[in-house]
């Protein structure tokens, strides 16, 4: 992506923060660089507890394990992603080295939440992976409506 001005870092932060879709960005060392307001609302974890740390898994899981962005930033092959998201993920049809998945998170909200999430590598001008971005959307209402239709 080409940037029109020298303040693209500020613009990126503003873009991520203003995005109504929960968004996480991690660097190549797995440190959270961006945890937007929507992500704080979705997870109940404030950005101040995540930025600069490598424990993003705590917002989603009871035990230490990678989130999808961690796998993508490491260049893990599909077989490695399958270890964590078996039967729940697919390659992005739009972006190379990107994946999407749906999964249930029982600790979120009352009765848990279904999330649809995507993760993609971010590369520098030389093509090296320097970060990964993950977006998350609450699809619980849709999943419950689908289940209700199946029960009829």
Model-derived regions, located:
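PAS/LOV-family and closely related PAS-like sensory domains
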Residues: 11-131
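PAS-associated C-terminal cap
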Residues: 1-11, 124-128, 137-152
């Amino acid at each position: 992506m080409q940037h029109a001005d020298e303040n693209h870092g500020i613009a990126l932060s503003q873009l991520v923060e203003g995005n109504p879709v929960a968004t996480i960005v991690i660097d190549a060392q797995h440190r959270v660089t961006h945890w937007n307001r929507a992500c704080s609302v979705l997870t109940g974890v404030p950005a101040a507890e995540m930025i600069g740390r490598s424990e993003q898994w705590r917002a989603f899981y009871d035990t230490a394990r990678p989130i999808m962005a961690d796998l993508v930033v490491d260049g893990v092959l599909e077989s490695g992603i399958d270890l964590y998201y078996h039967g729940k993920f697919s390659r992005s049809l739009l972006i190379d080295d990107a994946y999407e998945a749906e999964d249930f998170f029982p600790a979120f909200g009352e009765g848990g939440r279904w999330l649809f999430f995507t993760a993609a590598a971010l590369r520098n001008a030389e093509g090296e992976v320097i970060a990964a971005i993950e977006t998350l959307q609450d699809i619980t209402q849709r999943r419950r409506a689908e289940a209700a239709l199946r029960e009829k």
